[in-house]
Amino acid sequence: MNTVTMKNVEFGAGVPKICVPICGKTKEDVLEQAKIILDTPADIIEWRMDWFEQVENTASVVEMAKELREVFKETPVLATFRSKKEGGELEVSTEYYVELNCAVAKSRYVDAVDVELYTGDKEVETIVTTAHENGVKVIMSNHDFFKTPSKEEIISRLCAMQEKGADIPKIAVMPQSKKDVLTLLSATNEMVEEHADRPIITMSMAATGIISRLAGEVFGSCLTFGAAKKASAPGQMGVNDLKTVLETLHKSL
């Protein structure tokens, strides 16, 4: 299993890393949330571009990314435009989604971009190539806010991301039962043991899936999400509580 390094943060080794989202609408909101996060044990920041009111202007987005880079000099920044169909705030055309992600990657103000697996094969390839040409990592993702697919389907999607050049494949699914949480954990374990040659991120959402956000070191997920102020998905814990639990588990493993 290869690890992935952004700044001085190594993903896929030791305690799962903590990602804290920024979901500000205005430039002031974004910077205010950024300053709050500076005082937390966040390992990486996710800037949710789909929340940003100027997201349909690439120049404004790149300028905002530059300001975030100035705040987070040593902390990796992941830029994410989450589509409406996968739980995001805004829908844009596929063409603009590609343009936006490529512009942010070319700016080199971020360390990684999130690319949704089902954007389209050609479009995914364009963003992945552009990101890698500019030294930017790709977290490729898929989110199902309605159900938990079968173990085989979860593994299939993660393998597809790996084949398409993801530095870190990611899947988040919604449990309808505790058994669904076990399905996600079992898929994670099998993916890591039999298929993955790089770190992966998996989670079962909402309160039912909370154990999946805490047990990454046991089953093989390299990253978990915690909230400093505003949670970006159901089931996110506060970042300080999350850090305490992850460190406590680590000591016992």
Language-model segment annotations:
Residues 1-10, 251-253:
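Short, Lys/Arg-enriched, disordered terminal segments
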Residues 6-9, 67-68, 96, 151-162:
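Short N-terminal signal/transit or membrane-insertion segments
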Residues 9, 13-17, 24, 110, ...:
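Generic signal for short, ordered secondary-structure residues
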Residues 9-14, 70, 105, 162-163, ...:
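Solvent-exposed alpha-helices and their adjacent loops that cap or buttress functional pockets
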Residues 117-253:
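Catalytic alpha/beta core domains of metabolic enzymes, predominantly
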